[in-house]
């Protein structure tokens, strides 16, 4: 392709790109339909401040450039990462996409991260705590970052994920950042099956949350179980709510008061009798 004829695209930050992307992917599926491309590019060009007189001409060129350089999938869906690279710098692209390319496997893993960065146990992640999370994230991916850039990216992430604009992230905001997979407990219907089926399901559930394989749930394992249990009846929970329910669960289930929930203790709480 003759590069002299390609439109030169400006650069947005991740927050600007996300603002446009959400218009087309409101429920965060991670893709838009190919038929929406024209409208998407039009909104992006408007966001970049493209002059109205050249916008329509550029629209065709930008779409042509995308279709030529990207291996668009055959299912008519355009993934976020296929479009983000056209408008974002490498670091901004990483900020937006790391969550989709490194999804968490379980709520236990999620709660380990939550407890680590909610250092003051306030039930929220402050801007300073988010900065620490991002610093560790860049280090983990072997990416060098200056303190000035780190400050800038912290602000960008707050713009994207702090939905109520109170300057801090709650449990649900962080779950969106980390692309937590679907609630494990949704696949079970404990009240709609036989005793044997309930016992079998209980074994699967306990094995899933007992990540350390000690025969007891402790620390983030209890947190992960509590989070998923609560979200079955209340889709949006806060860190403060989670801590309260965790305390109630331990009070009722932790019979020997060791701060853990043994397998037999949890079974008793759920009204099951299991073989020792």
From Swiss-Prot:
Residues annotated to bind Ca(2+) 6: 254, 256, 258, 260, 265
Binding-site residues, Ca(2+) 1: 25, 27, 31, 36
Domain EF-hand: 12-47, 58-93, 105-140, 149-184, 197-232, 240-276
Gene3D superfamilies: EF-hand
Entries under InterPro entries matching the protein: Calbindin_Ca-bind, EF-hand-dom_pair, EF_Hand_1_Ca_BS, EF_hand_dom, EFh_SCGN
GO molecular function: calcium ion binding
Main localization of the protein described in the UniProt heading: cytoplasm
Record carries keyword Transcription: no
Binding residues for Ca(2+) 3: 118, 120, 122, 129
Keywords noted in UniProt: Calcium, Cytoplasm, Cytoplasmic vesicle, Membrane, Metal-binding, Repeat, Secreted
Residues at which Ca(2+) 4 binds: 162, 164, 166, 168, 173
Membrane topology: Peripheral membrane protein
Positions bound to Ca(2+) 2: 71, 73, 75, 77, 82
A cellular component annotation (GO) from this entry: dendrite
One Pfam family this sequence matches: EF-hand_7
Tissue expression: Expressed at high levels in the pancreatic islets of Langerhans and to a much lesser extent in the gastrointestinal tract (stomach, small intestine and colon), the adrenal medulla and cortex and the thyroid C-cells. In the brain, the expression is restricted to distinct subtypes of neurons with highest expression in the molecular layer of the cerebellum (stellate and basket cells), in the anterior part of the pituitary gland, in the thalamus, in the hypothalamus and in a subgroup of neocortical neurons.
Binding site for Ca(2+) 5: 210, 212, 214, 221
Location of this chain's protein in the cell: Cytoplasm; Secreted; Cytoplasmic vesicle, Secretory vesicle membrane
Protein name: Secretagogin
Highest classification ranks of the organism: Eukaryota, Metazoa, Chordata, Craniata, Vertebrata
Gene, per the UniProt record: SCGN
């Amino acid at each position: 392709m003759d590069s002299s004829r390609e439109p030169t695209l400006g650069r947005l930050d991740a927050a600007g790109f996300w603002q446009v992307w959400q218009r087309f992917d409101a429920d965060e599926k991670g893709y838009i339909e190919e038929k929406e491309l024209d409208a998407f590019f039009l909104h992006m060009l408007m966001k970049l401040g493209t002059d109205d007189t050249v916008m329509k001409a550029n629209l065709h060129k930008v779409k042509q450039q995308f279709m030529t350089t990207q291996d668009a999938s055959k299912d008519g869906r355009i993934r976020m990462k296929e479009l983000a690279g056209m408008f974002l710098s490498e670091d901004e692209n990483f900020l937006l996409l790391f969550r989709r390319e490194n999804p968490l496997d379980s709520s236990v893993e999620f709660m380990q991260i939550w407890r680590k960065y909610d250092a003051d146990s306030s039930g929220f992640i402050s801007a300073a705590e988010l900065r620490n999370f991002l610093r560790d994230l860049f280090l983990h991916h072997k990416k060098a970052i200056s303190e000035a850039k780190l400050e800038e990216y912290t602000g960008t992430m707050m713009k994207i994920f702090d939905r109520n604009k109170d300057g801090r992230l709650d449990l649900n905001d962080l779950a969106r950042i980390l692309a937590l997979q679907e609630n494990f407990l949704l696949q079970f219907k404990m009240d709609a099956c036989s005793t044997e089926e309930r016992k079998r399901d209980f074994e699967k559930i306990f094995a899933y949350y007992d990540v350390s394989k000690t025969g007891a749930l402790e620390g983030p394992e209890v947190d992960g179980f509590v989070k998923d249990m609560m979200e079955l009846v209340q889709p949006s929970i806060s860190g403060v709510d989670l801590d309260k329910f965790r305390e109630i669960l331990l009070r009722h289930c932790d019979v020997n008061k060791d701060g853990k929930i043994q397998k037999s203790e949890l079974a008793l709480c759920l009204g099951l009798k299991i073989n020792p």
